[in-house]
């Protein structure tokens, strides 16, 4: 079979020329175009050298690029080629740079697909692999390429303004969110937003599945798009019994026993007609992982069109076939992937989650975010996060907690292989909120180039993924900043490239009990402190976090009745306010209703 080489010489030349002649053009593409996107080696060398100029905060132009090429002893052939290319720049003026970028990326993706298909064919002959593993590895190869398909999106402000106005116009005529049917909750959330990851958490038997089914039933009644429930705990038949019980107000136990009167059969028949017309789909396959869910959704979308809402019951039962020695690392990967699924399919994705036992050991048993994330916290007196004040670009120590809307040094992590962060790029991120998380025992962690003081629950990035400080050993290597590289030119901050190194752990010492703090960094969910890269919580992948709490669950001496009150606590809401609403819980039918019915 003839092998076709996918490349476009003119497009590659055009991009190099554009970088050299147009000020700030490189800033628009350097995080989106990698060296390997270029097919010709000479262009790869030139683009890599341009990257170095940018990293060193040197103006990108022909003289500086030539100087760098000479200093790095690049061959005269490449240097002469660059001079010839630059002198020929006028011939590229009539070309559209966006077209050239599209052609460049199109050819790169075709090359990568060609290579991936060859790898997949090779994998099919490895009979030591199960079919499930083969499909997973194949999906991973293709999904990695798909990330490049979304990288380049240069748009003028006029184009963006037009798109925004059209979007606003659509919103005036059609709702772009999903109403839950719980009026007070919708008042806070303004419905469930597309591309959001929503976590509904509570202790066992608090009513998570019941709340989910009531929500799904409401949504299906309000809007007609397909709703998909992935139930990893209960069978489809169990869920159907619940739905029938909710619809007929007949207890599930009586339905299972067949203890139905003649008049109730009429109610049951009407309920069957109503439920049959709802656009709800159930999948009760167990041992699902996130790639299975992504694959199933893609198939469902081809059959039924756009999907309106996805529900997963529940998070802790989701699998990841490439096993990690620590479950919390798997869950961190899973939640991040679920968020990507919500964005890719442009729909709200609801995930039910268990809560830790920490709730049971407090007098006030209402859940808080730390019960979900179980993350650690930092001492501000002894640590130095790399802060950037909003009115200048100087580094500063953290001397108070009033740092909202200031900037901090964090990192983007490219997860090309699960649990292995292949590329780490320091970037500047906005601090959305600071949190005082308590008065706790802290430990001093000594490593090769610095020291950090933290609770042992806080996560740091190692070569094997995120680990709690308590779980670190002397064999672990943790992600740290190359400080000498960082302070280049004293105060410049936008010179970062891949200047993250891994340092060995030396010692862990218990210190004393002090006030500790955490930060909300919305996009990267991590930040550098004393040169160490730390995670600022697992739950940050979620856009909305809801907790369910019923007093009667703990107050067993309360008189039993046919109705019960349940608090739905909006503990996190990325798009708006937080708060609490009350709903009625019916233990007889295991369902939720609005506290005050619409007149």
Swiss-Prot record:
InterPro entries: DNA_heli_DnaB-like_N_sf, DNA_helicase_DnaB, DNA_helicase_DnaB-like_C, DNA_helicase_DnaB-like_N, DNA_helicase_N/primase_C, Hint_dom_C, Hint_dom_sf, Intein_C
Job description of the protein: A replicative DNA helicase, it participates in initiation and elongation during chromosome replication. Travels ahead of the DNA replisome, separating dsDNA into templates for DNA synthesis. A processive ATP-dependent 5'-3' DNA helicase it has DNA-dependent ATPase activity.
Organism for this UniProt entry: Guillardia theta
Catalytic reaction equation(s): Couples ATP hydrolysis with the unwinding of duplex DNA at the replication fork by translocating in the 5'-3' direction. This creates two antiparallel DNA single strands (ssDNA). The leading ssDNA polymer is the template for DNA polymerase III holoenzyme which synthesizes a continuous strand; ATP + H2O = ADP + phosphate + H(+)
One Pfam family recorded for the sequence: DnaB_C
Phylogenetic placement of the source organism: Eukaryota, Cryptophyceae, Pyrenomonadales, Geminigeraceae, Guillardia
Similarity annotation: Belongs to the helicase family. DnaB subfamily.
Statement: the UniProt record of this protein carries the keyword ATP-binding: yes
Name the record gives this protein: Probable replicative DNA helicase
Modification(s) after translation: This protein undergoes a protein self splicing that involves a post-translational excision of the intervening region (intein) followed by peptide ligation.
Subcellular location: Plastid, Chloroplast
